[in-house]
Amino acid sequence: MKMERKNVWQHRNREEIESFSKEYMDFMGRAKTERLAVREIRKFLEKEGFVPIEDFAGDPMDMAVYAVNRGKAIAAFRVVDDLKKGLNLVVAHIDSPRLDFKPNPLVEDEQIALFKTHYYGGIKKYHWFNIPLEIHGVLFRGDGEEIEIHVGDKPEDPVFTIPDLLPHLDKEDAKISEKFKGENLMLIAGTIPLSGEEKEAVKMNVLKILNEMYGISEEDFVSGEIEVVPAFPPREVGIDRSLIGAYGQDDRICAYTALRAFLEANPKKSIGVVFLDKEEIGSDGNTGAKARFYLRVLRQILKIQGGPEIQNSHSMRYWKKSAVISGDVCAAVNPPYKDVHDLHNAPRSGYGVALVKYTGARGKYSTNDAHAEFVARVRQVLNERNVIWQVATLGKVDQGGGGTYAKFFAERGADVYDMGPALLGMHSPFEISSKADLFETYRAYRALLEDL
């Protein structure tokens, strides 16, 4: 009668967990930005025979198609029946907290060249000082040519860093928000002056090096997107190697497990995965959830199937026949800080995929609150498939709050449930997940894609 927690390690084959974890870590080492994540996901899809939807020319009741939105979001669908009967969907976001170059980033101060940044998403600013950093992104030159920038991800590359103030001179008892200011998040770019230059000679030398490497000028930064991320690979954590430490596990751990579940599923009805951008800053913009680019893809599928192309997304009745799993992480109980949790409703590392009925803040503001009927369906499928799960909430009532994509998909009329692994150190440069929870999340997503 009593609900008891189960430790995944005591119920699963360790070799399976380790094999899956290694492949996941390889993916995470390559997918450190949303653009790079889309590139990796696309490789997985094309390897399994998926084609861009505009190139599809086969059986409309047997489709394996995908679509990319501006290189920052991607959706894929396996259609096995009339789409108007509905589909099962897992969604996740592939953006993560980071630093972005400002539009005019390069300055010189005290004979040190620096790149100015603006932080993206909810970070603790002090996390980003005194660690090795790498940069990735694109620039468009004045002639329109696209230039990819990648520095710091190879062993032979230099890295960047943001130096902090030494403790000997940092005796003031100031607030953290005052000690670590956003304007001080500047990367060291160089210290060697360009011979013959009298003014900003170090900055000029950095520009000279960039021009030699990429053929770019300072003005080209205006039409660029350069992202700053930690310059260390995913690592196993703990003497028993049971955990994974990596940047960007919120939320690329859900993206990877959803992708694997999607590609390996044997569905009875049409299924899909949607990986979107901008979740960490409110889901705005035309690559975020509010833009609903996936609906345009679904309309194309309906048109290919011979039905009327529905112009008004609100009239998509099939959406009400669909089930959506919002794949996102939650906060695992961290022993030194467990007082922020309601421990009776908090997830633990190693105890399976976490089911989150609602997020939001205060009085459940700005959330999707999954209906009991849908929760019952999900629970039944997970239990029938022997998936180990646990319940989760985002801390004590009024402790704080947060949100996911769930509410945006619920607005279309589908039932939606938040679900994913619990992390330690979420939104830090080195988030911690359990290998066991990683594997169990994959098993949960696959079960729900197949049987909901």
Swiss-Prot record:
* Enzyme Commission (EC) number: 3.4.11.-
Q: Which domain of life is it from?
A: Bacteria
Binding sites annotated in the UniProt record for Zn(2+)? 93, 168, 427
Broadest EC class assigned to this enzyme: hydrolase
Q: Name one GO cellular component term.
A: cytoplasm
Q: Does the keyword Oxidoreductase apply?
A: no
Required co-factor?
Answer: Zn(2+)
Which GO molecular function entries does the Swiss-Prot or TrEMBL record give? aminopeptidase activity; metallopeptidase activity; zinc ion binding
Endpoints of the signal sequence: none
Q: Which UniProt keywords apply?
A: Aminopeptidase, Hydrolase, Metal-binding, Metalloprotease, Protease, Zinc
Gene Ontology biological process: proteolysis
Record has Metal-binding as a keyword: yes
UniProt lists the family membership as follows: Belongs to the peptidase M18 family.
Q: Which HAMAP family match?
A: Aminopeptidase_M18_1
The name this protein carries in UniProt is Probable M18 family aminopeptidase 1
